[in-house]
Amino acid sequence: MSINEVRYLPECGSTNAYVKEHFEEFGPVGAVYTENQTAGRGRLGRSWVNAEGKALYYTAAIREPLAQPATLPLLASLAVRTQLKLRYGVDCQIKWPNDLLLNGKKIVGILCEGVSYG
């Protein structure tokens, strides 16, 4: 599965909300990212505090049916942790089901949401 389109937004309320609003515009797999997210949110409706210019906010849109969608947050956590270790030598820990910690501090939060379309 390869990414068909990546969109950069200088500022965005929420990358997840943007993808949900523009979902039909993406091909099978698309992505959007920003360095300034002004209305981020986490699981259970919690807010996600923005660190403008010091973080990357990224959402992937997958239009392909997933055999086991409930495993996506776990797989995403493992994939991001693996890439941080391989590419940057960052050895972080997974706080199941959706956070990555470095020295006890959260450095990644993963939020997976479904969208009905078609």
Per-range role (PLM):
Residues 1-89, 106-109, 113-116:
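N-terminal lobe of the biotin/lipoate ligase/transferase fold
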Residues 94-96, 101-102, 111:
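Glycine- and Gly-Pro-enriched alpha-helical subdomains that act as flexible
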Residues 102-103, 118:
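Short secondary-structure boundary/hinge segments and terminal tails
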